[in-house]
């Protein structure tokens, strides 16, 4: 056998035969639940800003329009009283924030991962790869290492750590997991997105309303998936197939969403026209993603879109599926019940989609539809587009 033929044989033996599939999903939140209607009073009181009455009224309107009913946060009143610098707008406080998040990110991630592994039903020794994503808590060794230890995974697990990405990488982790599963025969990839807002919490400022927007929207949560190709259907139950995945930077979007880690924590900066930039460009991503499948009716697919805020959802819907709010029902439900959990959000929506489909006795895991799309939006502006194929309910 020639060297070329031998190499081809080796490469073929290393690759899976079928597409990557999502085999299990687990989610977790902190115990502390924040009711959105009560949050403006709490926020301005705990930050000693009650004298800023006009600003509080603006914040109240932001919260009222957010479509959020409640959020979950690690930060409690007691924790904030113990760390008063975090309640100021721009006080040096990074050490206190880091001390919290490096511990809580991995703990919350573990909670979600344990649930996913339990649903999967297989020994954790079968996990071959770990992808961990978080916006905060940069540390060495990273949260991927810490989670490997917490879960008792094999030391030879191949790890990938993603820090400081923002809101879009719920799609990125699926893209990476797909590549890992399809190019490593027998691979089982544990994917974890864990987000804690302690690094971004700060008091209000009259001159930086974009920071206030984040205080009205963000919540804490973690989601975990098991991804693998060629599932053994005698012991594994596929939920969705990962058909394709793409990433793009939107034109003319420099500075639309920025985040900067400083002594004061992580600061966010938003342009007003983020919803417009996304809605203006989103159809191009859809056309490119679904052209190989021959689909151009966006009402015929199920939707999982990162809920950066109600304005983004409204404008994307108006652009692609006017009058069809049903397309984003699961997305709006998660926004309402949890707020914007950054990278974890779309994975929560994925979980809600399959559970809602089962409750309603739909024909597939995708709200009764065969094909779907998952969008991640975030700094850049970066858009992740993942094409999903649902699974018949009889095997889900």
UniProtKB/Swiss-Prot annotation:
InterPro entries: Chalcone/stilbene_synt_C, Chalcone/stilbene_synt_N, Chalcone/stilbene_synthase_AS, Polyketide_synthase_type-III, Thiolase-like. It catalyses: (E)-4-coumaroyl-CoA + 3 malonyl-CoA + 3 H(+) = 2',4,4',6'-tetrahydroxychalcone + 3 CO2 + 4 CoA. The keyword Acyltransferase applies. Keywords: Acyltransferase, Flavonoid biosynthesis, Transferase. The active site is at 167. Pfam families: Chal_sti_synt_C, Chal_sti_synt_N. GO terms for biological process: flavonoid biosynthetic process; polyketide biosynthetic process. Its EC number is 2.3.1.74. GO terms for molecular function: naringenin-chalcone synthase activity. It comes from the Eukaryota. The keyword Transferase applies. Pathway: Secondary metabolite biosynthesis; flavonoid biosynthesis. Belongs to the thiolase-like superfamily. Chalcone/stilbene synthases family. The primary product of this enzyme is 4,2',4',6'-tetrahydroxychalcone (also termed naringenin-chalcone or chalcone) which can under specific conditions spontaneously isomerize into naringenin. This is Chalcone synthase. It comes from Chrysosplenium americanum. The gene is CHS.
